[in-house]
């Protein structure tokens, strides 16, 4: 009885490695079950895999993902060579601080002109 149990313990992981070819139909990927037999699998013959993606297709997918990320980030812009990055965000003499940029700054980053600048709120 002990010998039977040890054989079952050895064969159980082995059965997990090999798919049940006779029970699977033509729904297998690449129809491996119809083309390969147990003898060929045990001899080390590997079934031909489905055609791997081409490198050009992978580049196209990567570029599409980058483009979709740019759409989701809103108005994040790349670097601009002319001037400092912060000059576009500071109000000029002719522009009031209560313009659309000022109200947006108040709403998003708790900027308050009454308090005299930025205030950091912890816990929110």
Swiss-Prot record:
Positions bearing Phenylalanine amide: 122
Disulfide pairs? none
Q: Name one GO biological process term.
A: grooming behavior
**InterPro entries reported for this sequence:** P518
Where are the annotated segments for Disordered?
Answer: 63-100
UniProt cross-references to Pfam families, sorted A to Z:
RFamide_26RFa
**Coiled-coil annotated spans:** none
Modification sites for Pyrrolidone carboxylic acid: 80
Q: Give the signal peptide as a residue range, or say none if absent.
A: 1-17
A GO MF term: neuropeptide hormone activity
Question: Where does the protein end up?
Answer: Secreted
Asked if the record carries the keyword DNA-binding, the reply is no
Q: Which UniProt keywords apply?
A: Amidation, Neuropeptide, Pyrrolidone carboxylic acid, Secreted, Signal
Single GO cellular component term: extracellular region
Regarding tissue, the record states: Expressed in the brain with highest expression levels in the hypothalamus and optic nerve. Also expressed in the trachea and mammary gland.
Q: Can you give the propeptide residue ranges? A: 18-79
Q: What does this protein do?
A: Stimulates feeding and grooming behavior, metabolic rate and locomotor activity and increases blood pressure. May have orexigenic activity. May promote aldosterone secretion by the adrenal gland.
Q: How does it assemble?
A: Ligand for the G-protein coupled receptor QRFPR/GPR103.
Q: Could you say which protein family the record assigns here?
A: Belongs to the RFamide neuropeptide family.
**PANTHER family, from UniProt?**
OREXIGENIC NEUROPEPTIDE QRFP
- Identify this protein by name: Orexigenic neuropeptide QRFP
Taxonomic lineage per UniProt? Eukaryota, Metazoa, Chordata, Craniata, Vertebrata
């Amino acid at each position: 009885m002990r010998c039977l149990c040890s054989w079952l313990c050895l064969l159980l992981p082995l059965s997990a490695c090999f798919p049940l070819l006779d029970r699977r139909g033509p729904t297998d990927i690449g129809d491996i079950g119809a083309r390969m037999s147990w003898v060929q699998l045990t001899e080390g013959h590997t079934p031909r895999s489905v055609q791997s993606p081409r490198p050009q297709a992978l580049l196209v997918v990567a570029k599409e993902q980058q483009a979709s990320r740019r759409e989701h980030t809103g108005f994040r812009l790349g670097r601009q060579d002319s001037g400092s990055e912060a000059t576009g965000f500071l109000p000029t003499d002719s522009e009031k601080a209560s313009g659309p940029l000022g109200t947006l700054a108040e709403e998003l980053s708790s900027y308050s002109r009454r308090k005299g600048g930025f205030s950091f709120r912890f816990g929110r």
